[in-house]
A protein has these predicted regions:
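Short beta-strand scaffold positions
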Residues: 2-3, 69, 90-91
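Phosphate-coordination/substrate-recognition cap region in phosphate-metabolizing enzymes
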Residues: 1-48
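Short glycine/proline- and acidic residue-enriched helix-loop micro-motifs
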Residues: 47-66
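Active-site-adjacent alpha-helix immediately C-terminal to a catalytic or transition-state-stabilizing loop
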Residues: 9, 72-126
Length: 126
């Protein structure tokens, strides 16, 4: 399953071409919409402070809670089918953070600091 955004989609198609595993677009894997913070540097103090407000939609964006809801719902669906298949999710750092929080308890600080490198492979078992 892959995000509809170009880099993730290209990566998933490459993986599919090499492995023969079918790839399918999953709209819920799209990165969080950061509203007024979209296309701004992620390391800035103002952005870091804004991320502490989990219920804030960043003036037209998507709150952390809404993001978690859509990813948790997707993971619940995958879990229901996990006896049948193994899934590869190709997505973004914000999505990886939510997936990590689905499988492991995290403090707010751990959640905010969590990240994976581009094309990293992380395995989770239900």
């Amino acid at each position: 399953l892959y995000s509809p955004l170009m880099r993730a989609a290209d990566t998933a198609k490459h993986i599919s071409g090499i492995t023969g595993i079918p790839a399918r677009e999953e709209l819920r894997l799209k990165e969080q919409n950061f509203g007024i913070w979209e296309s701004t540097p992620r390391g800035g103090e103002d952005f870091k402070k804004a991320k502490q407000s989990f219920a804030c939609s960043y003036e037209g964006g998507e709150s952390m809670l809404r993001l978690a809801q859509r990813i948790y719902n997707l993971l619940d669906e995958i879990k229901d089918k996990s006896d049948e298949k193994t899934y590869i999710l190709v997505a973004h750092n914000g999505i990886a953070r939510v997936v990590q929080s689905y499988f492991y308890d995290m403090t707010n600080e751990e959640y905010a600091a969590f990240g994976v490198k581009n094309c990293a492979v992380v395995r989770y078992d239900f």
